[in-house]
Amino acid sequence: MSQSLHRRTVLKCLVAAAASTAFGCHDDEPPVEDGRAYFPQSVASGDPRALSVVLWTRAVDPERPDADIAVTLVVARDEAFEHRVLEETGLLAMASHDHTLQVKVTRLEPRTRYYYRFIVEKDGQRLGSPVGRTRTAPAYDSKTPVRFAVANCQDFRGRYYNSWHRLMQLGEDLDFVLFVGDYVYESDSSAVPSPDPARVVRFSDPGSALPRDLGGGREELVAQSLSNYRDLYRTYRSDPFLQRVHERYPFIVVWDDHEFSNDCWDAHATYTDGRTEEFQPERRRNAELAFFEYMPLDTDAGAGVIDPEELPRYPDTRIYRDFIFGKHLRLFVTDYRTYRPDHLIPEDAYPATVAMDAAVLASLGLTGAFAADAFAYVNIDEFPAQRAVLRGAYVQLAVGAGLTAEAASMRAEALVKGNLALAYANPVLQAAAQPGAGPIDPAGKPRGLAFVHMGKQELFSSIGARNVVIKDTFDVYAAWRYSTSDGAAQQALGKDQEAWLLGQLREGVSPQTWKVMASSVSTTSMIWDLRAKPDVEPPTVRNRYYFSVDQWDGFPDKRSSLLAALRERTDGHALVVAGDIHAAFASVEQGVPCLTAPAISSSAVQEEAGAAVEAAGFPPGSAVYRYVVTEQAATFREGNPGIAFVDTNAHGFTVVEVGPEEVKAAYHLLPSSEVDVDYGSRPGDLAASFSRSDFRVRPGGTIDAA
């Protein structure tokens, strides 16, 4: 019998079913002493259901850190553990799973608070973990309102978890914490210096990490091996306030991108913006296994120890799931990253390439909309002199971006051909000033839509691809791709997940009052409208822009279809809760409210936009900088009248209460400038730094200030 088979057989034989009647401790039982040193990441619970919950810990013997360690799990109705419902011995925290252990406990009672701890026995002592507290979901017929916090994006590097600290101060009576992604960030601290050595991320095996060139002589390491990803979770879970939140509340967690790789899709990273191939399935599987080891997830219907190694991983991963909390809440936790296709505009798209030619525009009745000279194009193969100049310019730019001369030449031949937009080609030809290869007259030339018309200016860049794309032209292109691919180009959730979600929304399947979809990215449309800004220079910048098309703005037609289903199949009792964008939003999108929680600690979107706008050549004091950075919140509201509330310069969390008549939402916000202040040493000052904004979500898709 193989060691692997033996281990799995043992795990499957362990069943953690709570006793129906509480029992007490034995009179001769030795006391449990403080054993926190054996539980460096403390304890956690997750995926609460009416009759079950998953309990988690990481147990390590400091004197034998590479050895498996035997653990006992005790669950009780009281903090003193006098009324126990479970005492499970013989559990093993295995080194092969980084000493993590998670146990699904069943046969519990609905909406009941339980206390739990893990115990290690050594040298006659019983050494206990911190005591955890959890709560099961209410029974299906319970009318009790359900309360939960929404959180996301908790970069650890040089930043403090003041938001978690504040949640603990408030002592909210929550049924669970919903964490909608970016629990860890895949990068080490190489490029993010921290004066506090306790807020640094380092890899124990840096040689197995992936170097990432940030430009300007800056480099960082990003997780690649299983060891790297485990290091991230161990480090993040070392934070005392994150530990306390896990000790107090059960979590429901879904990943976004940074648990694997920034702006990822499927198993593809996007660090090099198309300069190199970044399909990384083994790296993806490593990221998933570490996530499964450290997150208490309910993965099947059975009871007992959960073996992360047995959980399906890429390409067979499934973490989307749903929860019922009484009569009023059905929660659908969706996975936006695993099944989604590539971003519609490739990061390495040649800006001049015509994506929709004159024939396509004519077939859609759009010829008149693109009649201006700016949309003129030619078949560059009919202009060999100009083609040679454009290819030479491509090679020069590509080599400057890091490609070899040979690779750049091959790409130039493959891309600089066929229909090319003069809006991009002519300025290049003008600058080259080669005799006999000057700019081409647009008069009489066909009109088409090229990537340059959507904001793509550089050969390899996220700008004009994943970020800051011109809305009106992008929408045309996205709709055409949607229709010609039978929806596949925008199938963000994948066919199976979407079918599951829509099936659960069928009449009679989900009788709960409110249907809440948890999405790691926001459905709120985030638009910068600079069209009527005469002080914006140059005039070519006066467009409407999507701030990010890595989120649902990048799949506008699929979003419309999904929101229509949510709206129509719930009788107006649908709600989306989301994160990712590092800002707080409350909006109504096509009749469906969306509450986007701010980041716990990651850089606020206003800060990120400021750096990007400056890098694009618009310094502070310029009109562009003023509109999209200084006055960013107002610009977002102007671009989307459905936005009821926005704060782009704050951290925090959102507390949601779901009742029979309405959903209440309280945004607890801390200025982003406070993220580098350690309020752990001055807790009395923290409350004064927070503000609160309250809203009510009502049936039919309305959001009002409370």
Which ranges hold each PLM region?
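Long, structured stretches of catalytic cores involved in phosphate-ester chemistry, encompassing
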Residues: 26-104, 108-706
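N-terminal secretory signal peptides and thylakoid transit peptides that target proteins
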Residues: 1-18
